[in-house]
Amino acid sequence: MIVGIGIDITEIDRIAKGWGRFGDRFARRILHPHEVVRMPAANPVAFLAGRFAVKEAAVKALGTGFSDGIGPRDIEVGVAPAGAPQLVLHGKAAARMEALGATRTHVSLTHGRDTAAAVVILES
């Protein structure tokens, strides 16, 4: 049974401005440490935009937004063995998922020229 669903569209230009102004410091504010290690040097802005879209969709699925002690670094976008994005929740985000009775997550992520979009589904 679906216990939460969230969707987000992130403008890549908005992320590019943060990256241009703050660089690595910007990335470390929104990425989990495991994501920082996986961030490509070739196109970090698209990577950041995609990860941010998933994180926004995830907090919508959790029903909290970025509040109640849940921040972007509590949500990690990992990579499943087949290469698909995989949600890994930490801290209060993981506790909220457990409180909802969710045991599985589903993530879809796509990039366009100007936007990144993501859908997150939490399932019990």
From Swiss-Prot:
Known cofactor(s): Mg(2+)
Reaction equation(s) it catalyzes: apo-[ACP] + CoA = holo-[ACP] + adenosine 3',5'-bisphosphate + H(+)
GO BP annotations, alphabetical order: fatty acid biosynthetic process
SUPFAM superfamilies reported for this sequence: 4'-phosphopantetheinyl transferase
Subcellular location: Cytoplasm
GO molecular function: holo-[acyl-carrier-protein] synthase activity; magnesium ion binding
Documented EC number(s): 2.7.8.7
Positions that bind Mg(2+): 8, 56
Gene Ontology terms: cellular component: cytoplasm
Chief location of this protein within or outside the cell: cytoplasm
Pfam families: ACPS
Superkingdom of the organism of origin: Bacteria
This protein's UniProt keywords: Cytoplasm, Fatty acid biosynthesis, Fatty acid metabolism, Lipid biosynthesis, Lipid metabolism, Magnesium, Metal-binding, Transferase
InterPro entries in alphabetical order: 4-PPantetheinyl_Trfase_dom (IPR008278), 4-PPantetheinyl_Trfase_dom_sf (IPR037143), ACPS (IPR002582), Ppantetheine-prot_Trfase_dom (IPR004568)
NCBIfam families referenced in this protein's UniProt entry, alphabetically: acpS, pantethn_trn, PRK14657.1
Similarity-based family: Belongs to the P-Pant transferase superfamily. AcpS family.
Record's function text: Transfers the 4'-phosphopantetheine moiety from coenzyme A to a Ser of acyl-carrier-protein.
Entry protein name: Holo-[acyl-carrier-protein] synthase
